[in-house]
Amino acid sequence: MATELKEYLVIIPDLPDVLAKRQVLLKPHNQDAAPLVKAGRVPFFGSTLAHHSAEGQQVAENGTVMIIKAESEEEIKEIIRKDIFTIEGVWDFGKLSIWPFKSK
């Protein structure tokens, strides 16, 4: 019998001064995450911003927010731990926040 997946709101900030590295790693990060998105395990994701940028200016991304469907918080930590953004030093794993969540 499969364990029921629960929803979690996941917020993980970037380490300081990694915007250029984030941009270089974005394509492989998205490719690695695609199976989770396609399977419906990550129904929502996006970047947090230091501030809203004017049109034509570089977006000031400074982290990620997402909803992940998982069996446990430990499973989410393992997903984040294996992500290229964590491995290559974009995300600040020590500041990972995981909140039980219910979509409406």
Swiss-Prot record:
It comes from Gibberella fujikuroi (strain CBS 195.34 / IMI 58289 / NRRL A-6831). Transmembrane segments: none annotated. Part of the gene cluster that mediates the biosynthesis of fusaric acid, a mycotoxin with low to moderate toxicity to animals and humans, but with high phytotoxic properties. L-aspartate is suggested as fusaric acid amino acid precursor that is activated and further processed to O-acetyl-L-homoserine by cluster enzymes aspartate kinase FUB3 and homoserine O-acetyltransferase FUB5, as well as enzymes of the primary metabolism. Induction: Expressed under high amounts of nitrogen via regulation by AREB. Moreover, components of the fungal-specific velvet complex VEL1 and LAE1 act also as positive regulators of expression. Finally, the pH regulator PACC acts as activator of FUB expression after the pH shift to alkaline ambient conditions. Disruption phenotype: Impairs the production of fusaric acid. Belongs to the YciI family. Coiled coil: none annotated. Fusaric acid is phytotoxic to plants such as cotton and banana. It has been shown to induce programmed cell death in plants. In addition to a mild toxicity to animals, fusaric acid exhibits acanthamoebicidal, antioomycete, and antimycobacterial activities. Pathway: Mycotoxin biosynthesis. PANTHER family: PROTEIN YCII. It holds the Pfam family YCII. This is Fusaric acid biosynthesis protein 2.
